[in-house]
Amino acid sequence: MKLAFLYAGQGTQRVGMGRDLYEAYPAFRRVLDEAPVDFDLKTLCFEGPEETLGDTRYTQPAMVAFAAGVTALLYEANIWPQAAAGLSLGEYSALHAAGVFTASQAIALAAFRGAA
C-alpha cells in the first residue's frame, strides 16, 4: 500500500490545537519547544486568543509547527509517506515531510511568509 501525507493550509487553526499531543508525546513537544519564532507558540496555540491565532503572522508558523509535530509522531511510529502534498501554506509542511527542510527551517520560512 502506498501512503501520501496531505497538509492543510491556513484556516484550519483552532485554539487548543496540539495541547493533548504536546502533553502526551515527546516528539511533538520537541518540535514546538524548538520552533524558531518570536512569540510564545504554545500559549497561543493552547490558550489563544482566537483573534491572535487567526492573524497570519502567527497562524502560519503555528500551523507548520503543528504539522511538523504530527509528522514527527508518524515518523516515530515508522509511518513514512511515498508522497507529500500541501494546500497553499501546507506546501511548507509537505516540503518538510519530503526532507527538503528541517522542521525548524519550515517553521522559520512560514514565519517569514506570515510576516510579509
Give the ranges of each region predicted by the language model:
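FabD-like malonyl-/acyl-CoA
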Residues: M1-A116
